[in-house]
């Protein structure tokens, strides 16, 4: 039963292939390519490999025109020779179409497998060349060195309950005394800083007051000295004036005494 099913499916597939082949064969293909470098303007017939679906390729629907700038005259002559050979092969395949069509799928799959193998081998060879050029560098994951665990670490990890008990236990007397002494020292330092600031401020105030007192004293002494100088100058001026006054007063007294004595004589 399986053989019959495979034969039926193969027949159906071949009917589809034959219909598409006849449709492409009936359709007109593109015009032949003419080489611009050739003097005789000969047609260049591209070479096709003889395959089971030959009418599809002979219909010239899958033709890629060759680039005239890169091909030489020797390539053109080889293409013409191989083209004639391909035509003869195509006639033979068309004549024996009934015999070759049964094994067309196998040949196509084999060719496809060979092409894939060729692509894979070329890719691997290119990778090998790149490694040979760039140098074979093998990158391996670097593993961090594991340090040996000391027994003390193990004991610390195995006894977390003891650590919790030590943390929750009340502080000892020595620790309390140390803390109290440290707090007193810190307070003394703070008070020392405060007292030093107060003493410095007091000294600065005393210095400023002393400067003001000295300035006022100098001003008072200057005023006294100026007043004494003025008194001396005034005394010096008033001395002769007082003498003149006394002399004038004494002369008047003498005149009055002379007049009185003169009247008495009369």
Swiss-Prot record:
Annotated Gene Ontology cellular component terms: endoplasmic reticulum; endoplasmic reticulum membrane; intracellular membrane-bounded organelle
Membrane topology: Single-pass membrane protein
GO biological process: autophagy; protein transport
Subcellular locations according to the entry: Endoplasmic reticulum membrane; Membrane
KW Nucleotide-binding (keyword) present: no
Segments traversing the membrane: 191-210
Keywords from the named record: Autophagy, Endoplasmic reticulum, Membrane, Protein transport, Stress response, Transmembrane, Transmembrane helix, Transport
Motif AIM (Atg8-family-interacting motif), residue numbers: 14-17, 218-221
Role played: May be involved in salt stress-induced vesicle-to-vacuole trafficking pathway. Through its interaction with ATG8F, may enable delivery of the vesicle bodies to the vacuole by an autophagic pathway. Plays a role in seed germination in response to exogenous abscisic acid (ABA) treatment.
Miscellaneous: Plants silencing ATI1 and ATI2 display decreased ability of seed germination in presence of exogenous abscisic acid (ABA).
Subunit record text: Interacts with ATG8F.
Protein name as catalogued: ATG8-interacting protein 2
């Amino acid at each position: 039963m399986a053989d019959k099913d495979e034969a039926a499916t193969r027949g159906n597939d071949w009917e589809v292939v034959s219909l598409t082949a006849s449709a492409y064969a009936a359709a007109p293909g593109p015009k032949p390519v003419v080489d611009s470098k050739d003097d005789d303007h000969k047609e260049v017939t591209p070479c096709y490999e003889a395959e089971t679906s030959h009418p599809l390729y002979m219909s010239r629907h899958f033709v890629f025109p060759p680039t005239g700038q890169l091909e030489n005259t020797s390539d053109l002559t080889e293409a013409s020779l191989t083209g004639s050979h391909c035509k003869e092969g195509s006639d033979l395949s068309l004549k024996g179409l009934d015999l070759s069509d049964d094994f067309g799928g196998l040949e196509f799959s084999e060719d496809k497998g060979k092409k894939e193998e060729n692509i894979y081998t070329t890719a691997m060879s290119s990778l090998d060349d790149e490694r040979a050029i760039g140098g074979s560098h093998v990158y391996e994951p670097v593993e961090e060195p594991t340090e040996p665990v000391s027994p003390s670490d193990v004991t610390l990890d195995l006894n977390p309950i003891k650590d919790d008990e030590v943390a929750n236990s009340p502080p000892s007397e020595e620790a309390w005394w140390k803390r109290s002494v440290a707090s007193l020292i810190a307070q003394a330092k703070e008070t020392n800083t405060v007292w030093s600031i107060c003493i410095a401020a007091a000294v600065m105030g005393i210095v400023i007051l002393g400067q003001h007192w000295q300035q006022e004293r100098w001003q008072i002494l200057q005023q006294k000295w100026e007043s004494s100088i003025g008194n001396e100058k005034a005394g010096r001026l008033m001395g002769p004036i007082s003498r003149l006054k006394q002399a004038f007063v004494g002369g008047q007294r003498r005149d009055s005494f002379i007049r009185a004595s003169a009247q008495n004589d009369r």
